[in-house]
């Protein structure tokens, strides 16, 4: 059992027969009354997200999640296809369940597939990935003074804020946990 106050982003637990993944968690202390935990959660099986609050002392059954090495093969319609690199088994995962992760991976990328018992529930991507800039505004001379950066669309469709000197066609290292630019590759 795990208390609501110990839940952090990325953890998975069971509640009312549902398998729930924490997307965001924060303590909130209102002016009057007790502390509450505000959370943004995702139902792992349906892919739906919702916001809720819990008392910090509420307890939940922590889900045991196993991972296996896999390779992203391709996406067709509403399904993403992955292959276990040890056994060569193929898995079909609804795109709604891995929509965010697909922004960080290209075909043939290495990932880890998450299992709850024998059920495939999601994908874990590496902490950093190398992606190519598909489109961005051209650099403007003297624009380095502000240092605010500019948006860039990467080859997967992900949009990140990058420094002004980045141009289309360059390879970048992206932090997948925060969705931010790290450096040029």
UniProtKB/Swiss-Prot annotation:
The keyword Protein biosynthesis applies. This is Elongation factor P. It comes from the Bacteria. Belongs to the elongation factor P family. GO terms for molecular function: translation elongation factor activity. It comes from Streptococcus pyogenes serotype M28 (strain MGAS6180). Pathway: Protein biosynthesis; polypeptide chain elongation. Involved in peptide bond synthesis. Stimulates efficient translation and peptide-bond synthesis on native or reconstituted 70S ribosomes in vitro. Probably functions indirectly by altering the affinity of the ribosome for aminoacyl-tRNA, thus increasing their reactivity as acceptors for peptidyl transferase. The lineage of its organism: Bacteria, Bacillati, Bacillota, Bacilli, Lactobacillales. GO terms for biological process: peptide biosynthetic process. Pfam families: EFP, EFP_N, Elong-fact-P_C. GO terms for cellular component: cytoplasm. InterPro entries: Elong-fact-P_C, NA-bd_OB-fold, Rib_uL2_dom2, Transl_elong_fac_P/YeiP, Transl_elong_KOW-like, Transl_elong_P/YeiP_cen, Transl_elong_P/YeiP_CS, Transl_elongation_fac_P. Transmembrane segments: none annotated. It is found in: Cytoplasm. The keyword Protein biosynthesis applies. The gene is efp.
């Amino acid at each position: 059992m795990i208390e609501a106050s110990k839940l952090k982003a990325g953890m998975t637990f069971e509640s009312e027969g549902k398998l729930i993944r924490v997307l965001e968690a924060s303590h909130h202390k209102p002016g009057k009354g007790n502390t509450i935990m505000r959370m943004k959660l995702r139902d792992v099986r349906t892919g739906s997200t919702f916001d809720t609050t819990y008392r910090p002392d509420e307890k939940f059954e922590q889900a045991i999640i196993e991972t296996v090495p896999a390779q992203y093969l391709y996406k067709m319609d509403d399904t993403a296809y992955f292959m276990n690199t040890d056994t060569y088994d193929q898995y079909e995962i609804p795109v709604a369940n891995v929509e965010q992760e697909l922004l960080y991976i290209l075909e043939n990328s290495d990932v880890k597939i998450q299992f709850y018992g024998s059920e495939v529930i999601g994908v874990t991507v590496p902490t950093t990935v190398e992606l190519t800039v598909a489109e961005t505004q051209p650099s403007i001379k003297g624009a380095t003074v502000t240092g605010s950066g500019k948006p860039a669309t990467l080859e997967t469709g992900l949009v990140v804020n990058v420094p002004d000197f980045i141009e289309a066609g360059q390879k970048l290292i992206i932090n997948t946990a925060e969705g931010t630019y790290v450096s040029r590759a």
